[in-house]
Structure formats: structure tokens, C-alpha cells
């Protein structure tokens, strides 16, 4: 059976994947949540100072992703930002611990898969690029998807504008 993978924009993104890390996924997520969205240099400083065991394999993975970016794509490491970082549960390694009188206790070692995607910040599209692509018409996708929210926001703005016309509206006489 083939696994369908997400297609990534190859022009501005680079990824690195570490599989079968002997650590539970929720302990690794505690560290990953701190670095998501940060720049490459700030991430390195954070990971070196964090007191968690999960920070070392994640640090190695961020180094690897940055090396992929500079070697394969020619990106500058100072412009890299962690755009996506995810931790998925892996297989559970099951062992038996021998105990007294021929008994044994099961030992379960959880593993996880860590995926980090770095994005080159200098090559991201600006608003001006979107305007040029749409032939001079800039479309805000959030407003298009939720027109009722935009109308509600305009009503609130108009309400406060009306209140500002009367500066003494709440003053007691």
C-alpha cells in the first residue's frame, strides 16, 4: 500500500525527518511547541538551553534541515524560519524484564517520528506579488471566506464612530 504524502512547495521549503526516536511523542511535543514559528538562530539558542532530554534529537534535526537548505537549495541559514514542526507517535518497542521465580514484566518503550519544515523567509511572497498575480486585484481570502464576520466588524466600527461624535454621551448631569 502506498502512502500519500503532502506535496510541499519545493521552491521555498526544506524538510528533515527523524524516525524511531526512543521517546514518547507528548514529551517531544513539549519542546516542538516552543520552537514552531521561530527563526533558525533563535531556535538553536532555545534548544541548547532547554533542560529536556527531547531537545538534543530535535537540535540535531534542526541542524540537519538547515544543512539540507544550504546544500541542496542554496538558502542562507540566517533567513530560515521553522514553518512546520510536528511529532507523530511511532512504534512501541516491547521487551520483557526477567523477574524472580521465572516471572517477567513487560516493558514498553514508545518511539516517535519528528518532522521539521524550514521556510526561507527572504523568498516568501509579498502582498505586491499577490496583487500582480491577480491582475491588480488584491483578494483577502479570510474576508472572502467569512463575509458575515467582516460585516459584523464594520458594524462595530461604525457604532464606535457614532459614539465618538457625541463625547458626553455617558456623562451624568
Swiss-Prot record:
- Gene3D superfamilies recorded: Ribosomal protein L22/L17
The name this protein goes by in its record: Large ribosomal subunit protein uL22c
- Which positions are tagged coiled coil? none
Q: What molecular function terms (GO) are annotated for this protein?
A: rRNA binding; structural constituent of ribosome
**Role played:** This protein binds specifically to 23S rRNA. The globular domain of the protein is located near the polypeptide exit tunnel on the outside of the subunit, while an extended beta-hairpin is found that lines the wall of the exit tunnel in the center of the 70S ribosome.
Q: List the disulfide bonds.
A: none
Q: Name one GO cellular component term.
A: chloroplast
| Lineage, opening ranks | Eukaryota, Viridiplantae, Streptophyta, Embryophyta, Tracheophyta
> Known Pfam families for this protein?
Ribosomal_L22 (PF00237)
A GO biological process this protein is involved in? translation
Q: Cite the InterPro entries for this sequence.
A: Ribosomal_uL22, Ribosomal_uL22_bac/chlpt-type, Ribosomal_uL22_bac/org-type, Ribosomal_uL22_sf
